[in-house]
């Protein structure tokens, strides 16, 4: 595999959100190793140490992949403050790769060993270090974290200025970028909760607090959104696996040692050593996590440090931080009993009694605040969900303004508005507005929302979006509005991406007849084909689409000059449909075999490989075999691929020819007349594993046919025996049946073909 191809498929310059220089250097080495990895596997070490070396390299490569993915999918703010730990992970990956490559170098051939040596030299010369500008940004954000822990923090204007400067330097300069950053932070919080890492959760919660607090800075920005109609791959959550280990944790601790004012503490700042007893949870404030100086009771019955709970209330909370219970009042009652218990515990354990309230607020505060906010949003979501889209107040759309402007205005509302409320608002607006023009603007907003938000697809599907969009598409067809048809089709496409439930709803709601109506409009072919591709991935949809007008339509696209993406989608859709055996007669009757003939020898690999994959599905049907044998140039094209194709294509072609030649001796004669023996011998030595096996089987088949043909030719054709009694002759070997005579004639031709091919001294019978 080519290095550039591996790199293009996995990591491209600019993918990394931060630490791009380190990522690019490591990804180049990763791609070089991956390009020769098949050769390493092909070495097939027999010794235990060799197998362990290869397995070790595979594990290290997975860790490298996870590190690069972490830098491309994680939060920019989080990457900035954990720069030191990221550098440590890169250094550890470098060390592990070096060790693994040295072990593998001993078990491979010299030619591959020289390539490994070059990679090792490049790896050893690679230095990983933080970019000074990125380190400065990280220090700025850490400074904000320190200020966020103070009860008497600096003014919001100063905080705003510092955060805006840091965010701008990180590229968070638009509403779109701010939304992406908030989503990344939420995913980090979810992972921290799964790992029960309260420190990490608290720090990320405060970063999310800052993002929410200052997202209004970006709300006036206009972003550009280009939809990819044929893309079904969506952003996935960051995967931080074994590469984040104990060493990373220690580096993270060192990085945050500067934040000692808000690290988790078991007692006050004057604690003696790490060996002293940990205070009972009942004596520590749930917010500051320290021994309480002035414990007070709130309406829920929980006890807190006075200064901490007062800040909680002053920030607008009217719930208990620990139980999330709505408080009937915000009065504070001193808890003298707990204060006495604290004094007693300190005396017994030799710990100094707190002599004042904490000077700073632990970041645990922000974790609790986020938890309360999420529980409130959940209750709001349940209330909105239970109302079933009724009695919801919606802001009507204005008559003027472009789709892009309105999408920007509604896409980024206040952070307090939940996703459920947004989905509900859009669906209700779509139902309430009366003109197709207004509906079109709403559907465009829905399309943008669904494009890269899996949760939105789920919520929209559960709340009637499928039916609403199909109704809109029907109206667009009735009014012959091409642009509305395209917008509606792409909204349905986005709704169906990676969501089988929504696909099932579309089928049940009658999407196929609407798509068949759209086939009359050439401008809609691209969006219609994209939906067919999306639906064809669903098993339940294959028989429905296979028996519709979609099959002749998509087969016709393979013949005609149309958009490349449209033709690609059609070919992939037909491949999915061909995996369902009852569809094969319909595909054959649509003349699919002839349509694929020219694509099998296309200059572009994507056409050849997928066309051969479709043919491999069709050849499993008896009628499919007959159709292929009778196709004018298909067998010739397959033989050409044996000589000029890529290894995977050669494997597919030889598999097809093996099945066809086993099915028909006529096909065997056609294949041999193409002079394929040298190509088959080459594949049997240098092809893929399956390609080698099938090339050998095909050569064996030809050898058996040749031997049978030679035996037949050497047998006496006619033997006369004279009877002594009556003196007449009897033809003991006479053959009178028509069918065997035809076979004999065919074998004579085969014999001539074989005798011609085996005259070459370069290829003996034993080579076949």
From Swiss-Prot:
Pathway: Protein modification; protein ubiquitination. Pfam families: U-box. The keyword Flavoprotein does not apply. ARM repeats lie at residues 454-497, 500-540, 542-579, 581-620, 623-662. Its EC number is 2.3.2.27. InterPro entries: ARM-like, ARM-type_fold, Armadillo, RING-Ubox_PUB, Ubox_domain, Znf_RING/FYVE/PHD. GO terms for molecular function: transmembrane receptor protein serine/threonine kinase binding; ubiquitin-protein transferase activity. It catalyses: S-ubiquitinyl-[E2 ubiquitin-conjugating enzyme]-L-cysteine + [acceptor protein]-L-lysine = [E2 ubiquitin-conjugating enzyme]-L-cysteine + N(6)-ubiquitinyl-[acceptor protein]-L-lysine. Residues 278-352 form the U-box domain. It comes from the Eukaryota. CDD domains: RING-Ubox_PUB. Keywords: Repeat, Transferase, Ubl conjugation pathway. One of its GO terms (biological process) is protein ubiquitination. Functions as an E3 ubiquitin ligase. PANTHER family: U BOX DOMAIN-CONTAINING (PTHR23315), U-BOX DOMAIN-CONTAINING PROTEIN 45 (PTHR23315:SF306). Binds to SD129. This is U-box domain-containing protein 45. It comes from Arabidopsis thaliana.
